Curated annotation (Swiss-Prot):
Organism: Anaplasma phagocytophilum (strain HZ)
Phylogenetic lineage: Bacteria, Pseudomonadati, Pseudomonadota, Alphaproteobacteria, Rickettsiales
Recorded GO CC terms: cytosolic large ribosomal subunit
Subunit and interaction comment: Part of the 50S ribosomal subunit.
Coiled coil start-end: none
Gene: rplM
This protein's name: Large ribosomal subunit protein uL13
Length: 158
């Protein structure tokens, strides 16, 4: 029996909608990275972009465990001498960049190569409940119901 290898024409991509309200960022990002890579499919092929497209809504209401909302620090560099910038998740939320929290977490779980960059383009994150992908008919996934640890707050473990 020969080893199965997926061809480019055989890839079947679907759209997945995930509501990030009161969800823990790390667990959510790990699950999104798995979907983007396609590891949840039986026909997973490591060198192909066989993952699904993911739409995340309500990114502004994600949660961190413990005190990470104020203690965790994201660093970036402008490229100029002395240009090291830092901000906390609280700063990002107050400045209106809630999408970046999820995007950075998922990006760091995907890897560094050209295939990871192509897979990352299949992620769409919105801070509110509205998204512009109704024409793609995304399938809603209830991430909070998969495990009690996935969420914090009132609707955790629905």
């Amino acid at each position: 029996m020969r080893t199965f290898s997926l061809k480019a024409g055989e890839i079947d991509k679907r759209w997945v909608l995930i509501d990030a309200s009161d969800m823990v960022v790390g667990r959510l990002a790990a699950y999104i990275a798995t979907i983007l890579r396609g590891k949840h499919k039986p026909e997973y092929t490591p060198h192909m972009d066989c993952g699904d497209n993911v739409v995340v809504v309500n990114a502004s209401s994600v949660k961190f465990t413990r005190n990470k909302m104020r203690d965790k620090v994201y660093y970036r560099h402008t490229g100029y001498p002395g240009g090291l910038k830092s901000c906390t998740p609280n700063d990002m939320l107050r400045a209106g960049y809630a999408e970046r929290i999820i995007k950075v977490a998922v990006w760091r779980m995907l890897g560094d190569g050209p295939l990871a960059r192509r897979r990352f383009k299949n992620l769409k994150v919105y801070s509110g409940p509205e998204h512009g992908h109704h024409a793609q008919k995304p399938v809603a996934l209830d991430f909070g119901a998969m495990n009690n640890k996935n969420g914090r707050g009132n609707n955790a473990g629905r």
